[in-house]
Each structure stands twice: as structure tokens, then as C-alpha cells.
């Protein structure tokens, strides 16, 4: 379990760096409510982006992006509604992205950013 938490935290750090280098601003990390947790919340222009990060070392459980199930998507949407209620800023555009990371398949992690994933 601790190994999985460390892998997840490492993946979130990689994703945050990747998104920042792509011009996005990370405005919240690991935001929690009664519905669970959003990994990253970012701004890209006038877009507010809720980001689910999935990190894997192998494909034994499928690709990282495949781990974002319908129930996980629904939970992230509920979290987004709560976050928006608490936000002092009005966001007119919201989307949900997935950052899928494979570690250990080459010298560098493989990062796939799926915009508007769900």
C-alpha cells in the first residue's frame, strides 16, 4: 500500500511539472471532500481543469487511462461541483483531463495528457 501511495505521489509530481511546462497553472493539489479527492486542479487561460492522474509501472491492470472508470469520473464531477461552490472565482469553462503515466518502460516516464477526457 505504501509503495502504491509513493508511486501515486511521484506520478502527481510528474504530472504537475508536465502541465506547468505546458503552460497550465496548478491552483490546487489533492483537494478533498466527502466524495474523495481531486489530484490536480489547474487553470489554462479561462479554463478550469480538473485532472485525474494515473500512474502505472506495468500493464497488468490495464493502461493508466483505463483505470479512470465511469464511477471514478462521476465522483470527480461531484468533487468539481463542490470545489466550484467553494471557489471565490467564477469559472465559465470547465473540463476534465486525465494524465496517464507509465514508469519503468524506458529511461523517461511516458506521459499522455488526454484533454477533455470525460
Swiss-Prot record:
CDD domains associated with the record: PoNe_Nuclease
GO MF annotation list: nucleic acid binding
Source species, domain of life: Bacteria
Protein family membership: Belongs to the UPF0102 family.
HAMAP family: UPF0102 (MF_00048)
Name under which the protein is recorded: UPF0102 protein ROP_66030
Species per Swiss-Prot/TrEMBL record: Rhodococcus opacus (strain B4)
Amino acid at each position: 500500500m505504501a509503495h502504491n501511495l509513493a508511486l501515486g505521489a511521484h506520478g502527481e509530481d510528474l504530472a504537475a511539472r508536465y502541465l506547468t511546462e505546458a503552460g497550465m497553472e496548478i491552483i490546487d493539489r489533492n483537494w478533498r471532500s466527502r466524495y474523495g479527492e481531486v489530484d490536480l486542479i489547474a487553470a489554462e487561460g479561462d479554463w478550469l481543469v480538473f485532472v485525474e492522474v494515473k500512474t502505472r509501472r506495468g500493464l497488468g491492470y490495464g493502461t493508466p487511462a483505463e483505470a479512470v472508470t465511469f464511477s471514478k469520473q462521476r465522483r470527480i464531477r461531484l468533487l468539481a461541483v463542490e470545489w466550484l461552490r467553494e471557489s471565490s472565482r467564477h469559472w465559465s469553462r470547465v473540463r476534465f483531463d486525465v494524465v496517464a503515466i507509465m514508469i519503468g518502460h524506458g529511461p523517461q516516464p511516458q506521459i499522455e495528457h488526454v484533454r477533455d477526457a470525460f
